[in-house]
Regions:
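Conserved N-terminal Rossmann-fold NAD(P)-binding element of oxidoreductases
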Residues: 136-139
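Hydrophobic/small residue at the entry helix of a nucleotide-binding pocket
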Residues: 143
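NAD(P)-binding Rossmann-fold cofactor-contacting core
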Residues: 154-171
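Rossmann-like adenosine-cofactor binding region
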Residues: 166-261
Length: 306
């Protein structure tokens, strides 16, 4: 059996471990002349460059990312190819990034950095707390669950979730799955976290009308996809100080153009789609690869099937 692995995503230590663990498998790290591979362990960007019709023995694709909005899932499934993603790999680091963005605003970190630069000692009183607040998490998958766990530790009063199904994951106080419920979350929450996949239903989910529902002290943090928020409506909302601020790890487009007004707004904190960054990322991808590869070889159900 021959399997392609995107070597750079495994790390220089883990890739040899993979070869040692499965000595009967021929692992390749390029696809030139290897159209007979039976599995691809691959980044979305690499996959999108391939003509899958050439890979007549292909049975499984393991994406090395959680998001798959840029992958033609229907086409892959039409060819009876199994496809899985890496949804749990990035959840911890993304959840920590969300907390960092909230604390950036709550503890006035930009202001105090400016004070340091100017050698000024000028404290602010009555800085907001996460404690006793209401949090709305749009998306209660692996990222949402890690977020809820952390917000509980901060002593929040309520955690609302918005998701398709009605089941209530641990640490959530209430789950909504319709438009009325979404409006309740937006009207009630001090912190709105977007952790939804991008689909035709979630594109521009947070539009101008829904931004108007947010409390004046609300913070909105997007670690999902930029297109879930109507960016022009958000810019208008922020310029008019209708909400306290926005922490954005994702924008439309990416990279964010230098002439975008978002760069100059004092109530925005932008990071370059880097919330998942972690020294443990490659190890977690390696562990996921090991687990699903074992399942694939033994004809067991794969984890994180799309």
């Amino acid at each position: 059996m021959k399997i392609f692995v995107e070597k750079r995503m495994m790390g220089r230590i883990n890739y040899p471990k993979l070869i040692k663990k499965f000595p009967k498998i021929e692992f390749v790290d390029n696809l030139d002349g290897h159209e007979d591979v039976e599995a691809l362990i691959i980044m979305n960007s690499t996959l999108n460059k391939l003509d899958l019709d050439k890979f007549i023995r292909l049975r499984w694709i393991q994406l090395l990312m959680a998001g798959y909005d840029n992958v033609d899932i229907n086409y892959i499934k039409s060819k009876r190819i199994l496809i899985t993603n890496a949804r749990d790999v990035f959840s911890i680091s993304i959840a920590e990034d969300v907390i960092a963005k909230i604390l950036y605003f709550n503890r006035n970190m930009k202001y105090y950095q400016d004070c340091m630069n100017d050698k000024v000692w000028n404290p602010i009183s009555k800085e907001p707390e996460i404690f006793n607040s209401t949090v709305g998490i749009l998306g209660s998958g692996s990222i949402g669950k890690e977020l809820a766990k952390r917000f509980k530790a901060f002593g929040v009063e309520q955690i609302f979730g918005y998701k398709k199904s009605k089941d209530k994951p641990e640490n959530f106080d209430q789950i909504f799955n319709d438009e009325e419920g979404l409006e309740t979350i937006l009207k009630s929450s001090d912190y709105i976290i977007i952790a939804l996949p991008l689909t035709k239903d979630t594109k521009n989910l947070i539009n101008s009308e829904r931004l108007q529902l947010l409390k004046p002290n609300a913070l909105i943090v997007n670690v999902a996809r930029g297109e879930i928020i109507d960016q022009e409506a958000l810019i208008k909302c922020l310029k008019q100080k209708q909400i306290r601020g926005a922490g954005l790890d994702v924008t439309t487009p990416e990279p964010l153009p230098k002439d975008s007004e978002l760069w100059s707004l004092d109530n925005v904190y932008i990071t370059p789609h880097n919330a998942s960054s972690s020294p443990y990322m490659k190890d977690r991808l390696f562990e996921l690869t090991l687990m699903n590869l074992e399942r694939f070889l033994n004809n067991h159900k794969l984890k994180y099937l799309i």
